[in-house]
Amino acid sequence: MLGLQSKQNPIQNPHTISTAHMGPLRKLRRVIENCCTSGGPATMSPIGVRLSVQDRYVTIDNGILQLTLSKPDGIVTGVQYNGVDNLMEVLNKEDNRGYWDLVWSEPGSNGIFDVIKGTDFRIIAEDDNRVEVSFTRMWDPSLKGTLVPLNIDKRFIVLRGSSGFYTYAIYEHLEGWPDFDIAETRVAFKLRKDKFQYMALADNRQRIMPMPDDRLPGRGQQLAYPEAVLLTNPINPELRDEVDDKYQYSIENKDNKVHGWVSFDPPIGFWQITPSNEFRTGGPVKQNLTSHVGPTTLAIFFSAHYSGADLVPKFRGGEYWKKVFGPVFMYLNSSWIFTDPQLLWEDAKIQMQIEVDSWPYNFPLSEDYPTIEQRGSVTGRLLIRDRHADDDYIYADSAYVGLALPGDTGSWQRECKGYQFWTRADAFGNFTISNVRTGDYNLYAWVPGFIGDYKFDATISITSGCFIDLGDIVYAPPRDGPTLWEIGIPDRSAAEFYVPDPNPNYVNRLYINHPDKFRQYGLWERYAELYPDGDLVYTVGESDYTKDWFFAQVTRKSDDQTSYIPTTWQIRFKLDTVYQNGSYKLRIAIASATYSELQVRFNNLNINPPHFSTGLIGRDNSIARHGIHGLYRLYSIDVKSVWLVEGENTIFLTQSRSTSPFQGIMYDYLRLEGPSGSDANERI
């Protein structure tokens, strides 16, 4: 059953900056407070936290903000702050303002969208320093087919002196309950469109946004799919002829820590802060939505975006499952003298770092949320052994190292039921993974600059308070022989390849002269415009992959423009000698695939079956959704010497599936290795 606990713990308020480890942040916050405030310091709010419970509403007030929740639904119906009676969209129905939701289905059925409404309300804690309330919805067999078979406990917390509120939830599927899939769960906030029109996701991803009305017929024209709209007659004429698409604002988990909206009159910021990734799925580079036109801000805990069904949790055979999502923090700030939304953004980043450094929090009272004392840590040093790159061990500089549920090597990127804990190694390969929940894990890693995945060969059992030192561990990346040639950088992204400018009729001006130009709409159409008479040909030793290798192998339209046809790329290279003893090896690392099949042929385009085929792979949809990667795949192809010739050789790469413009492959890296032990040590 869901655990409810009322034990009072001493509260460490993240809004009180510790001088022990927050010195620089404290100084910067003081500077910003000259013109920007998070509601003022706690001394400006001498009253404690007050809870008021009525028949249909629950109100929590700490003198800085007032949070109103429907009862027993647990929907955020109002947030009063800085003289504004409600920051939520008052034009929306009350159950369409601030809510937890999910998309679920019975096996083989279509997804059902469910705004989670509680049926029972409980006070978990109530004193001057903290109020925590609970809204639960319990499942029983009479609800089969109508509600997702989960017990759900939604929590909301307001602390004294805190300019914001926290929310988290516990989902539980009891043993023997029905099978189901859950494609997505999140917290969504719909803000007032007459106030919040400036959105910020990163230092270089901020802009005035369209109004939701601009996406409707008469003001906007739908493009290739409903999410993408060309603004033909927007309310703000400066946005005319821009493309709006929520997927242009996706962020990788590792960078998805703070985003939100700014109101100009009065100057207020509403920010969604996620202090930890432990409850998200898919690892550090899984991409998710953030904020978009609405104005909407999201805290997404898991989704199938940029991955497909591989990241949809599927519960079968009556398995037991419980997971805590959050807490996440909704932070409010304001400016005394408004000059630039950048001030509120900078303050929000400071608060984000404070929340991150305060994790795990000590104030949530669910027994399912472990304190820092109940968690453990793992440390070690990761080294790389690649005799063809260096005779000595190589430090795993900036490696991604993480703990996830036990599984096969690389399984972490598809794991979607448990918790994951990730860190980056330093320049010498040293890593520490702190504040890990108790349980059994495998340790996984991957290293930018090297192909493949690492998995430590033993299960790691985390107990309360443990500190496990693994010492030196060694990753030997896939390697059979010396590198003859390579294309790209093995970093699980296609960002290093050629990304074209968009059609000038379909631009998002935020991404003009921006490092993320791959987020522009319609780049898949640019391939055929750049290669009108034939497909891409890459010549090793002459071509430059930053200019001559298109970032995605997409389809092209047929001559009569009524259908799509496959594309075949060529890699041309010379071999002075073909060694007959031993096989060559072609490594193809794929950064993303969408309903694709890669067929590989050597020096014979017409041979069937091909020398190698991946079969049908991928549902990432990264091409349509402006990603530069999806799920990582690595293929190691044995290349028989009889397939090669002395002199000119050609590898044909055919993406053979072609019913849509969005089918295709993004390559991460390609490498041809000579036979092991041969004299083929000269790079081409």
Predicted regions and their residues:
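Short, acidic Ser/Thr/Gly-rich low-complexity loop/linker segments typical of extracellular
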Residues: 409-430
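Beta-strand-rich ligand-recognition modules
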Residues: 425-428, 564-581, 589-683
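Structured interaction patches on ligand/partner-binding surfaces of diverse proteins
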Residues: 448-472, 476-478
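A contiguous, surface-exposed recognition patch within enzymatic or periplasmic domains that forms
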Residues: 190-323
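Acidic-aromatic substrate-binding/catalytic surfaces of carbohydrate-active enzymes
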Residues: 55-121, 127-141, 146-148
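A short, solvent-exposed beta-strand micro-motif common in secreted/extracellular proteins
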Residues: 429, 439-450
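A short, amphipathic beta-strand motif
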Residues: 376-388, 429, 473
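Short, ordered, surface-exposed loop/turn motifs in non-cytosolic proteins
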Residues: 377-378, 387-416
